Amino acid sequence: MAISKEDVLEYISNLSVLELSELVKEFEEKFGVSAVPVMVAGGAAAGGAAAAAEEKTEFDIVLTDGGAKKIEVIKIVRALTGLGLKEAKDAVEQTPSTLKEGVAKAEAEEAKKQLEEAGAKVELK
């Protein structure tokens, strides 16, 4: 009895990620091929599209400038981070400073909005 494509696909869909990775390596060795995607002409445009498709899910909130209303910014930094007054003041005055790391996109954007409304400059990395 011959094995159909559907049987092969069903078998592959039931593999764990580790087993699938090992299978790909064996294919590469046996057939002398590579699983690396081929770059096409106009690579810069394709690279931008790939980056957009692979959207980040975790962000670092980096304060780049405390702005003119430092007291208001310090209050927001304290509320966002739970830092004490001195630590928050140092973070606002010694820029750039990373306020939070590995934050969800929605939380990072909300923090950025609050800080920018107070006059600070913020980057999400």
From Swiss-Prot:
GO molecular function annotation = mRNA binding; structural constituent of ribosome
Its cellular-component GO annotations read:
cytosolic large ribosomal subunit
UniProt xrefs under InterPro entries: Ribosomal_bL12, Ribosomal_bL12_C, Ribosomal_bL12_C/ClpS-like, Ribosomal_bL12_oligo, Ribosomal_bL12_oligo_N_sf
Q: Which controlled-vocabulary keywords does the entry list? A: Ribonucleoprotein, Ribosomal protein
Is-annotated flag, keyword Ribonucleoprotein? yes
Give a Pfam family name: Ribosomal_L12_N
Presence of the UniProt keyword Ribosomal protein in the record: yes
The entry's function note states: Forms part of the ribosomal stalk which helps the ribosome interact with GTP-bound translation factors. Is thus essential for accurate translation.
Matching entries from PANTHER family are given as: 39S RIBOSOMAL PROTEIN L12 (PTHR45987), LARGE RIBOSOMAL SUBUNIT PROTEIN BL12M (PTHR45987:SF4)
Summarize subunit and interaction data from the UniProt record for this chain.
Homodimer. Part of the ribosomal stalk of the 50S ribosomal subunit. Forms a multimeric L10(L12)X complex, where L10 forms an elongated spine to which 2 to 4 L12 dimers bind in a sequential fashion. Binds GTP-bound translation factors.
Q: What is this protein called?
A: Large ribosomal subunit protein bL12
Tell me the organism's taxonomic lineage.
Bacteria, Pseudomonadati, Campylobacterota, Epsilonproteobacteria, Campylobacterales
